[in-house]
Amino acid sequence: MAGGTQGVAAIVPAAGSGQRLAAGVPKAFYQLEGQTLVERAVRGLFESGVVDTVVVAVPPDRTDEAKLILGREATIVAGGADRTESVSRALSALSAGVSPEFVLVHDAARALTPPALVVRLVDMLRAGHAAVVPVLPLTDTIKAVDANGVVLGTPERAGLRAVQTPQGFSTELLLRAYRHAGVSAFTDDASLVEHVGGQVHVVGGDPLAFKITNRLDLLLAHAVVRG
């Protein structure tokens, strides 16, 4: 990236098929009470007042549709074969303009994330932390299980957290993490940063930042929007 640093950019990987949702369309394009999930996710980022630009990675055959839905609100790029490739392509798209100081990566499926959570995250970044993720304490007991279905142990719940998005990073750290991503499978961007030795801090998450993955999640999302 060239031309100095400025502001906060957000990347929204929205190229997944959404097979578990079984909605008949890619998950990000599901209509939740009149607005697609990706539309709600992007607008929530802007409503925070701390995000300057958004890049959305969508299925290659949905780029025109995404441009119609989002208009000039976001830059649209064709996503890749997996989440890591989609985010990488979105990062490349950011290089066309002024390099942001920070980059947030936010799941389109967490479409109801409150703008206040985005503000808390960016405040932590501006306070000097290079990587910040929102988390919630676990309420269920967690078991480690082997391939044969045998319980190996019970991790101490007090030290475990469920991780949400958006996840925020200094641009330099996130770019370095993606340069060293290789072929390893990472389920989130914080894992990539941990892989290159980055220290990740946490900020309090929000129950409304839940990930819409299955039909039960959809029922909850509709209920939340309807109030």
Swiss-Prot record:
GO process annotations (BP): isopentenyl diphosphate biosynthetic process, methylerythritol 4-phosphate pathway
What Enzyme Commission number(s) does the record list for this chain?
A: 2.7.7.60
Looking up InterPro entries in the UniProt record yields:
IspD, IspD/TarI, IspD/TarI_cytidylyltransf_bact, ISPD_synthase_CS, Nucleotide-diphossugar_trans
Q: Where is this site: Transition state stabilizer?
A: 20, 27
Q: Which UniProt keywords apply?
A: Isoprene biosynthesis, Nucleotidyltransferase, Transferase
Q: Which reaction does it catalyse?
A: 2-C-methyl-D-erythritol 4-phosphate + CTP + H(+) = 4-CDP-2-C-methyl-D-erythritol + diphosphate
The record's similarity note reads: Belongs to the IspD/TarI cytidylyltransferase family. IspD subfamily.
| Stated name of the protein | 2-C-methyl-D-erythritol 4-phosphate cytidylyltransferase
The yes or no answer to whether the keyword Transferase is present is yes
State a single Gene Ontology molecular function: 2-C-methyl-D-erythritol 4-phosphate cytidylyltransferase activity
